[in-house]
């Protein structure tokens, strides 16, 4: 049974999403919500993120909204190092702080500022070691930063009994098409 899941994927700019009100976000959040609800019904208790912009932050927002329906659901934010948001613009820092305020657990893997890329790799390993499953939104057709984590994830899953769900754009598009179709049907 999956009690703790790590959800990660593209950063917003890797999806060419630069505004909080971009229509794509609505659909991605609906997809994430649908995925999480299925896991919650099977016993999911905790969702962990590292606090990256994009899929992870949208996941946090979804978890926070799901707490109304599932009050036992918990959100953990495990940053790779202290002050990892210091180079973000003010709007993104405010969004992050709102999530931190509503998270059930926050911590940094490294209790120091950025020292090198090894901190990201060690944090990725920490997430694998402390969760039962990863949901990774990543598609080989659009290579970006999650490709490094994907390699680590696949190797880890092959060596252990770890569960991974690598979500492609095809799966997301099928969900979006179904969602749009059901929205159109409800207006008739």
UniProtKB/Swiss-Prot annotation:
Domain of life: Bacteria
A Pfam family matched in the record: YpsA
PANTHER family on file: UPF0398 PROTEIN SPR0331, UPF0398 PROTEIN YPSA
NCBIfam families (alphabetical): PRK13660.1 (NF010181)
Family the UniProt entry places it in: Belongs to the UPF0398 family.
Protein name as catalogued: UPF0398 protein Sca_1081
Species in which this protein is naturally found: Staphylococcus carnosus (strain TM300)
């Amino acid at each position: 049974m999956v009690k703790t899941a790590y959800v990660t994927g593209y950063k917003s700019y890797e999806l060419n999403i630069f505004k909080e009100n971009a229509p794509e976000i609505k659909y991605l959040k609906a997809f994430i919500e649908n995925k999480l609800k299925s896991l919650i019904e099977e016993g999911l208790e905790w969702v962990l993120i590292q606090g990256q912009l994009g899929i992870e932050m949208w996941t946090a927002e979804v978890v926070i909204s799901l707490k109304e329906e599932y009050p036992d659901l918990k959100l953990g934010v495990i940053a790779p190092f202290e002050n990892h948001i210091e180079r973000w613009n003010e709007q993104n820092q405010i969004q992050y702080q709102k999530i931190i305020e509503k998270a059930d657990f926050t911590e940094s893997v490294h209790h120091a500022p950025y020292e090198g890329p090894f901190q990201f790799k060690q944090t990725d390993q920490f997430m694998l070691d402390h969760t039962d499953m990863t949901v990774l939104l990543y598609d080989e057709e659009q290579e970006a930063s999650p490709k490094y984590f994907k390699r680590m994830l696949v190797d880890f899953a092959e060596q252990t009994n770890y569960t991974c769900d690598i979500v492609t754009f095809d799966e997301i598009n099928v969900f979006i098409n179904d969602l749009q179709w059901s929205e159109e049907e409800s207006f008739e």
